[in-house]
């Protein structure tokens, strides 16, 4: 991920398809930076599916991005959670699914939110939506310094490669860098062909992304939930017996 620009403080992670591993890459990158003695925050900006928040058991946590941007939550400190993995690593969950995610990401309040995080942290690592699902990733990227585009071996159809190349060539994303996830290191016959196309494109370009999971409930966080334990499970850091 070699780039020529200055400090790459806000890092957005996206992909072509769901299940490419962008949330896994986001979390591991943030942890690596925290271990390097940098103050880091992970922000779940997939406001439609809230994948990272779901992985952490916080999908219905009202104290998240959507609540803060909408004005329901006034204090930024109320949506910042300590990860429990490292003192340098915080997490901001997505909050409840808003009716207008793209509009929320285009708001002045969102710009102020990101500016505040830039002041507070050395690095802001954003878990965004798949770039070919909805416009949210392109909207968010206007505030990013670096874009990590995750491709998963065996998932991406080769017919999608020209679209990814076009994103790179036309500089749709700031300092776009590619991460190949799940690589076995060897050649694979018929790589991805005939699998990703129907999933990525039929899924895609905004139609229905996250709509089937829309919830406006006032769910209360399970008091038994342990954020640190879930993060360790997700990162594979638990002690083996």
Question: What is each residue range found by the language model?
Answer:
Residues 1-241:
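P-loop NTP-binding module
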């Amino acid at each position: 991920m070699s780039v020529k620009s200055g400090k790459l403080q806000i890092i957005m992670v996206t992909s072509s398809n769901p299940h490419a591993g962008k949330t896994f890459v986001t979390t591991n990158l943030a942890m690596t930076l925290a271990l390097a003695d940098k103050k880091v925050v992970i922000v779940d900006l997939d406001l439609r599916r809230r994948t990272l928040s779901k992985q952490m058991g916080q999908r219905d946590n009202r104290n998240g991005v959507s609540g803060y941007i909408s004005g329901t939550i006034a204090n930024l400190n109320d949506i910042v959670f300590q990860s429990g993995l490292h003192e340098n690593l915080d997490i901001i969950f997505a909050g409840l699914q808003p009716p207008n995610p793209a509009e929320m990401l285009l708001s002045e309040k969102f710009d102020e939110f990101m500016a505040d995080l830039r002041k507070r942290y050395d690095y802001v690592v954003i878990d965004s939506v798949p770039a070919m699902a909805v416009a949210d990733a392109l909207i968010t990227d206007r505030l990013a310094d670096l874009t990590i585009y995750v491709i998963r071996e065996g998932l991406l159809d080769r017919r999608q490669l020209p679209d990814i190349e076009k994103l790179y060539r036309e500089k749709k994303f700031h300092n776009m860098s590619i991460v190949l996830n799940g690589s076995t290191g060897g050649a694979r016959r018929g790589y991805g062909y005939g699998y990703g196309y129907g999933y990525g494109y039929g899924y895609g370009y905004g139609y229905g992304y996250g709509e089937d999971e829309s919830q406006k409930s006032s769910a209360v966080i399970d008091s038994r939930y342990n954020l640190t334990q879930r993060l360790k499970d997700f990162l594979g850091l638990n002690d083996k017996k």
